Amino acid sequence: MIPQAYISEWYQQVPWQTMEQVEQDLVICRALVEIFSDDLLANSLALRGGTALHKLFFSPQQRYSEDIDLVQITAEPFGPLVDRIRERLAFLGEPKRSPKANDFTMYFRFESEFPPIMNLRLKVETNTREHFTVSELIKIPFEVNSQWFMGSCNLTTYKFGGIIGNQAAGIVPTQKRP
């Protein structure tokens, strides 16, 4: 999908050790620009999770990300958003879809370009129920500058404290109250 020369070029911009990680990082970055360059998606979804934390608030990134975690910030039917995400990420092919009560996940699969050929995956998971937020939404400029893809957008996300709080809530076990 991505010529090896462009993956090697991206290797100079990211701290990852394997070419598969570099390739997947470039795919994630393009996917973010594709999603948040679309007005409907940018006004209906917010980026959160480890990818938001490490791509937007730490330089250089401290942790490798394999997925995109989104939250639907508007109470509206999700079907049109799924269709639009699929359109924007058409360069990845047709996703496997996994709808659940509170989220909708799309799995895009592709093969790495450098031998040994490996199956890579991009998971785009959207929480479809948390429309209310205490943490203020913000827009953060984001760009990809590669010979394979160039683009920029303003990512809709949460302030640093909101992302950290969400990450902490995800790792603290839920205790049942008596």
Residue ranges of predicted features:
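Metal-dependent nucleotidyltransferase catalytic core
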Residues: Q72-M106
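Terminal (often C-terminal) interaction modules
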Residues: M1-W10
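Catalytic cores of NTP-dependent nucleotidyl/adenyl transfer enzymes across multiple folds
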Residues: S8, V14-P15, M19, C29-V33, ...
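Hydrophobic (often cysteine-bearing) scaffold residues that line and stabilize catalytic clefts
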Residues: E20, Q24, L81
